[in-house]
C-alpha cells in the first residue's frame, strides 16, 4: 500500500464530507447518533468478542497493565458508549448559534456564529471507546473526522466503525464523515499530522511518547495534554471522612487514567491523624507510598513505604504508586501544585469556604475541584455527553473537550447598505 497516496485520498474524502456535515440539520445528526447507540446495544456480543481477540493478542505481546485496562471493553463500558451518544443527542446543537450581537455607530450589526472546525484527526492507542466518543461528538458538531486507532484495538475499532457507518447511512449523512484508517502502519500517523490542507486539528489520545512525537512533527494544530499529574490537598480544615473517601477514590478507582491522583499533599496539622487512616485503606490495594521525610516518619511500619525522590513529584505513575508530601499550609500546597502539576486536575478537601475559593483562583489547572475526587474530570461526568479528549493547554480548548471545543467562532455582519467613510 502506498501510505502517502492512501492518506491523501482519505483526507480528500474527509474534506468533501466536512462541507456536507457543516450544513447538515440537527435532526439528521441526532438520528445518526441514535442509530449508532441502538446498534452498539444490539451488537454488544459482537463487540465483546472483537475486544477479546484484541486482548488476547495484547497479552501475548506483553502490553502493560495500564494499557490493558484502557483496552478492555466491559459491559459497563459498552453501555456508557451508548449512553454517551444519547446524551449528545440531548445536547443543544451549537452550530449556527449567533451570539454577542451589537449595533455599531455606523449602523452595522456585528455578532459571532459558531461553526465546525472542519476535519478533525484523532490519534489514539488502546482506547476503543474513543472511536465512538469521537465519532459522536464530531457528528453532532458538524465535523468530519479521521480516526487512527492503535493496532492493539484494531478488531474492536473495525467493529465499532461498521456501526458508525451504518448509523450515518441510515440518517442520510455521508459515510466519509467518519473514516477509520485501515492500516496499522505507523507511517499513516506521519501523513495525517502533516496534511494541513485536509486536516484542521489533531486530537491525540495516548501515552507521553506519542504526544511528544506529535508535538515535534505535527504541522496541524493540536488539542492535547501531555501528562496527568493530579493532586489532592487535604487541608487542616478538612472533614476527615470526606478526606478518606476522596483520597482513596482519586488514587484507587482506576490506576491507568489521566485524572488519577499521583501526589497527595497533607497539611502538617492534620497529617498525624489522617495519614495512618489512609494508609490502612491503601494497604488493602497494596499501594506503594513514596513519602517525604515527614510522611515516612508518620507512616513507619507501612508495608509498602519508600522515600520519594525529586523525580517522583513530576511523575505520572499510572500504577498503584502514590507520592505523599506533608506541607505546612495551603500556601505551600498551592506552590507545590503550580510547580509540579501538569495543569490537568487538582482538588482540595476543606470545610473552609475562603480557602476553597482561594484554591480555585490560584491553582492554574484545567479543572480545579473542592471536596471531590479528581476522577470526576471527565466529559461524561461534566455533562458533555462524552469527550474527545482533555486539554491542559490554554488556547482554544481547556479541560474536557466536548461539542463547543470542536467549534470556532466567525464574525457575522448585518448591514442595510452601509459603506465605510
Swiss-Prot record:
Transmembrane segments: none annotated. Gene3D superfamilies: Aldehyde Dehydrogenase, Chain A, domain 1, Aldehyde Dehydrogenase, Chain A, domain 2. Pathway: Amino-acid biosynthesis; L-proline biosynthesis; L-glutamate 5-semialdehyde from L-glutamate: step 2/2. Pfam families: Aldedh. The keyword Ribonucleoprotein does not apply. GO terms for biological process: L-proline biosynthetic process. NCBIfam families: PRK00197.1, proA. This is Gamma-glutamyl phosphate reductase. It comes from Herminiimonas arsenicoxydans.
Amino acid at each position: 500500500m502506498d501510505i502517502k497516496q492512501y492518506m491523501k485520498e482519505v483526507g480528500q474524502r474527509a474534506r468533501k464530507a466536512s462541507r456536507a456535515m457543516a450544513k447538515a440539520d440537527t435532526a439528521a445528526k441526532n438520528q445518526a447518533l441514535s442509530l449508532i447507540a441502538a446498534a452498539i446495544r444490539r451488537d454488544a456480543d459482537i463487540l465483546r468478542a472483537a475486544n477479546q481477540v484484541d486482548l488476547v493478542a495484547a497479552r501475548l505481546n506483553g502490553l502493560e497493565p495500564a494499557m490493558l485496562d484502557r483496552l478492555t471493553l466491559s459491559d459497563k463500558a459498552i453501555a456508557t458508549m451508548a449512553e454517551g451518544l444519547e446524551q449528545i443527542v440531548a445536547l443543544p446543537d451549537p452550530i449556527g448559534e449567533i451570539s454577542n450581537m451589537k449595533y455599531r455607530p455606523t449602523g452595522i450589526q456585528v455578532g459571532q456564529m459558531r461553526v465546525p472546525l472542519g476535519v478533525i484527526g484523532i490519534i489514539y492507542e488502546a482506547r476503543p471507546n474513543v472511536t465512538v466518543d469521537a465519532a459522536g461528538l464530531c457528528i453532532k458538531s458538524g465535523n468530519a473526522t479521521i480516526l487512527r486507532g492503535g493496532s492493539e484495538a484494531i478488531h474492536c475499532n473495525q467493529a465499532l466503525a461498521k456501526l458508525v457507518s451504518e448509523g450515518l447511512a441510515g440518517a442520510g449523512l455521508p459515510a466519509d464523515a467518519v473514516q477509520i484508517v485501515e492500516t496499522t502502519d505507523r507511517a499513516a500517523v506521519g501523513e495525517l499530522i502533516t496534511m494541513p490542507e485536509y486536516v484542521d486539528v489533531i486530537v491525540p489520545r495516548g501515552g507521553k511518547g506519542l504526544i511528544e512525537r506529535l508535538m515535534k512533527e505535527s504541522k496541524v494544530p493540536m488539542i492535547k495534554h501531555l501528562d496527568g499529574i493530579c493532586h489532592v490537598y487535604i487541608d487542616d480544615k478538612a472533614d476527615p471522612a470526606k478526606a478518606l473517601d476522596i483520597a482513596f477514590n482519586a488514587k484507587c478507582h482506576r490506576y491507568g487514567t489521566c485524572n488519577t491522583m499521583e501526589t497527595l499533599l497533607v497539611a502538617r496539622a492534620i497529617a498525624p491523624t489522617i495519614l495512618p487512616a489512609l494508609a490502612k485503606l491503601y494497604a488493602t490495594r497494596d499501594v506503594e507510598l513514596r513519602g517525604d521525610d515527614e510522611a515516612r516518619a508518620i507512616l513507619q511500619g507501612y508495608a509498602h513505604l519508600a522515600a520519594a525522590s525529586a523525580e517522583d513529584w513530576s511523575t505520572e505513575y499510572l500504577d498503584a504508586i502514590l507520592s505523599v508530601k506533608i506541607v505546612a499550609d495551603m500556601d505551600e500546597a498551592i506552590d507545590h501544585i503550580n510547580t509540579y502539576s501538569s495543569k490537568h486536575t487538582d482538588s482540595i478537601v476543606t470545610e473552609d469556604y475562603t480557602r476553597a475559593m482561594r484554591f480555585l483562583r490560584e491553582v492554574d489547572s484545567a479543572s480545579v475541584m473542592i471536596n471531590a475526587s479528581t476522577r470526576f474530570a471527565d466529559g461524561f461526568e461534566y455533562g458533555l455527553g462524552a469527550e474527545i479528549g482533555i486539554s491542559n493547554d490554554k488556547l482554544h480548548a481547556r479541560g474536557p473537550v466536548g461539542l463547543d471545543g470542536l467549534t470556532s467562532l466567525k464574525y457575522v455582519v448585518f448591514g442595510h447598505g452601509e459603506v465605510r467613510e
